[in-house]
């Protein structure tokens, strides 16, 4: 019966997009305020029916210092507790609830939509189509999801506390497929995870998928992973266990195998208008004058010549990923419908992939244009109308000043969450330089932002580490961008004799002297090198550094997210070099299959996993138990009088917390002077004063004092 209900939902979802009446209009030439000579026809045509039933070098001393010792009695299987039930909303109130939400946002939504498409004479028709289908998706949203929406509306700060712990993973690498993942939910709960980010799992062509970011069908799961029914069942089971699901939504482009792309390739003008097609290179050359390349070495250029159609198509990422034309309102509408469809399958957090790139304009760099913010603002309002329990996570891997605007304003918010990408990059910069000044500056900048802004904090993810640092600040110390990037990459790839890190470069561009970095946390901390050398002291110290970096990440303001495998110190996987589909992409170095054999060691204290996993478990529980880690609690840095030691303070009415982190290979003294009583180190249980704290090489303290 459950399966039949799910199938009925699928059928209803397909029909919702397909039933919009699309009377033929006369062809239209859209003017673009003379900023570019692109003509886009936007005849209102029948929407595509998408089938969903197919279904400076460093001397590394190896001074003997004990790794963290943590008492661990938690060896029993995790007890799965169901999330507390939310009172159901009477069905008769559904329409009034929807009308109230719509009325709250309608004027602004209309204004922004009509302003964005003011040159389109059919703008009113497109807007009405959008509003009509929004209501249909609301009607199809099941009661459990509506109840969750209602509960979260009553507590809009539900994601800003200290109770969310995230993990990101590839389904196939972790458990084979969606059903396999469902069978591993006990382990995920044992990792204290209640925010599960599943890397791209929608239909994409094998060998031309860009790790799943070349989507051929937004309403179909990759066949090797299962079906959309399997996904909906997984989200339902996760919700019963209090686990929120995050899923990537690739906005900038589709695969060349998408139905729209196929019809465009066959010469259908209305589908070519959903992308950027040109008969010759005249207009593309204007774009290329100011638009940087995303992948200058692996996929140079912003356009691809299609021999079969004798046209150029815009492909800013890979040649098989065709950029969508958001100047066409049909594109925006259809992509919003796809987002709402995924929300109705139980997605709690929608990750807006490559969102800064979605609006193109000649004479600009085609990044972070005002129209992008207009679209994200509209998406936020549409979610608040149809599915207000859903969060938007913006993937904005840009310079710091470009990231924050994607939060919008307090009155007109855009994304709920953003990646704390600059702090992540600054952390690894500190690992390589052993100088915390840049990291401290970055933390101070984040601390100065409104507390409504919530960042997603992380050490590693599926992607590379890009060196988007504050070079204006570094130049004050005579540090120049290009040679400094080279030093960072050389250190973290182990080119210096005494470097402990083992990483690989990604997209090395000799012309710019630029490259990005790949590798797992454990390999970058030295566990790989010292393990290979059978240097037990070195391994213990590397484990300590791994713990310290995670402790620092967990003590920041926001939501911590661990990359699957980091909890068991998984090392680089070099086997990708033997796979023709992966060999050219070094990011697969840290995308290897999850090592379940290593996970079995997590309760054996003599193993690497037994020394790491229990400490991370304790840190995560401490964070959830102490209100001082709430996202809305202010954070500030304090002087330690040592360039290698970082100290941060978080304080509310109940507690005062001081986190101290040693980024040096030497034992140090943190010359802090918080003369306000005795503190307890939450990690070891020791009591000490927050004055002249002795801290081991690559070690840390979590000092806490209760005020009441």
Which role fits each region the language model picked out?
Residues 2-10, 79-708:
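Active-site and adjacent substrate-binding regions of carbohydrate-active enzymes
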Residues 14-82:
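Long, intrinsically disordered low-complexity tandem-repeat segments
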């Amino acid at each position: 019966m459950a399966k039949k209900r799910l199938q009925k939902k699928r059928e209803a979802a397909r029909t919702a997009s397909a039933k919009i009446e699309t009377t033929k209009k006369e062809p239209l030439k859209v003017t673009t305020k003379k900023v570019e000579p692109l003509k886009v026809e936007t005849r209102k045509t029948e929407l595509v029916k998408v089938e969903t039933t197919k279904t400076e070098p460093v001397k590394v001393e190896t001074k003997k210092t004990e790794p963290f010792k943590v008492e661990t009695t938690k060896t029993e299987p995790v007890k799965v507790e169901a999330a507390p039930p939310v009172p159901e909303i009477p069905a008769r109130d559904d329409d009034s609830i929807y009308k109230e939400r719509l009325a709250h946002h309608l004027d602004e939504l209309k204004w922004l939509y009509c302003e964005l498409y003011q040159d389109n004479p059919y703008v009113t028709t497109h807007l009405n189509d959008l509003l009509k289908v929004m209501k249909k998706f609301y009607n199809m949203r099941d009661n459990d999801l509506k109840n969750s929406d209602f509960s979260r509306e009553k507590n809009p700060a539900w994601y800003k506390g200290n109770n969310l712990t995230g993990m990101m993973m590839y389904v196939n690498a972790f458990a084979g497929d969606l059903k396999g993942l469902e069978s591993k939910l006990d382990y995920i709960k044992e990792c204290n995870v209640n925010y599960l980010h599943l890397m791209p799992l929608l239909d994409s062509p094998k060998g031309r998928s860009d790790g799943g970011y070349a989507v051929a069908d937004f309403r179909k799961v990759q066949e090797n992973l299962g079906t959309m029914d399997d996904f909906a069942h997984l989200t339902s089971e996760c919700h019963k266990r209090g686990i929120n699901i995050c899923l990537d939504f690739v906005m900038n482009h589709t695969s060349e195998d998408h139905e729209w792309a196929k019809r465009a390739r066959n010469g259908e003008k209305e589908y070519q208008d959903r992308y950027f097609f040109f008969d010759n290179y005249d207009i593309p050359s204007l774009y290329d004058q100011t638009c940087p390349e995303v992948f200058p070495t692996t996929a140079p250029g912003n356009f691809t010549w299609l021999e079969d159609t004798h046209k150029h198509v815009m492909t800013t990422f890979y040649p098989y990923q065709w950029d969508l034309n958001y100047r066409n309102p049909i594109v925006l509408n259809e992509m919003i419908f796809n987002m709402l469809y995924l929300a109705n399958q139980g997605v709690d957090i929608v990750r807006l992939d490559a969102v800064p790139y979605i609006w193109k304009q000649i004479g600009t760099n085609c990044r972070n244009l005002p129209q992008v913010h207009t679209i994200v603002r509209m998406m936020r309002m549409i979610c608040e109308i149809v599915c207000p329990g859903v969060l938007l996570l913006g993937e904005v891997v840009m310079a710091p000043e470009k990231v924050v605007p994607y939060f919008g304003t307090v009155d007109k918010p855009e994304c709920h969450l953003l990646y704390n990408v600059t702090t992540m990059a600054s952390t690894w910069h500190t690992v390589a330089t052993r100088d915390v000044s840049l990291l401290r500056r970055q933390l101070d900048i984040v601390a100065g932002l409104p507390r409504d802004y919530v960042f997603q904090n992380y050490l590693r993810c599926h992607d590379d580490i890009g060196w988007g640092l504050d070079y204006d600040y570094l130049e004050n110390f005579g540090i120049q961008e290009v040679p400094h990037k080279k030093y960072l990459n050389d250190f973290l790839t182990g080119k210096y004799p005494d470097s402990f890190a083992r990483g690989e470069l990604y997209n090395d561009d000799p012309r710019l002297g630029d490259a990005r970095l790949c590798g797992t946390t454990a390999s970058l901390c030295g566990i790989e090198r010292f393990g290979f050398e059978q240097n037990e002291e070195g391994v213990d110290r590397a484990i300590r550094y791994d713990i310290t970096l995670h402790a620092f990440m967990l003590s920041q303001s926001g939501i911590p997210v661990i990359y699957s495998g980091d909890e068991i110190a998984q090392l680089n996987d070099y086997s990708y070099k033997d796979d023709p589909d992966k060999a050219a992409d070094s990011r697969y170095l840290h995308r290897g299959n999850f090592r379940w054999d290593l996970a079995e060691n997590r309760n054996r204290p003599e193993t690497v996993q037994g020394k790491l996993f229990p400490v991370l478990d304790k840190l995560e529980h401490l964070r959830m138990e102490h209100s001082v880690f709430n996202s809305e609690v202010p954070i500030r840095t304090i002087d330690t009088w040592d360039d290698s030691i970082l100290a941060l303070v978080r304080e509310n009415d109940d507690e005062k917390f001081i986190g101290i982190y040693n980024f040096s290979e030497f034992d140090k003294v943190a010359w802090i002077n918080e003369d306000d009583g005795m503190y307890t180190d939450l990690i070891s249980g020791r009591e000490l004063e927050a004055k002249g704290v002795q801290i081991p090489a690559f070690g840390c303290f979590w000092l806490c004092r209760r005020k009441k």
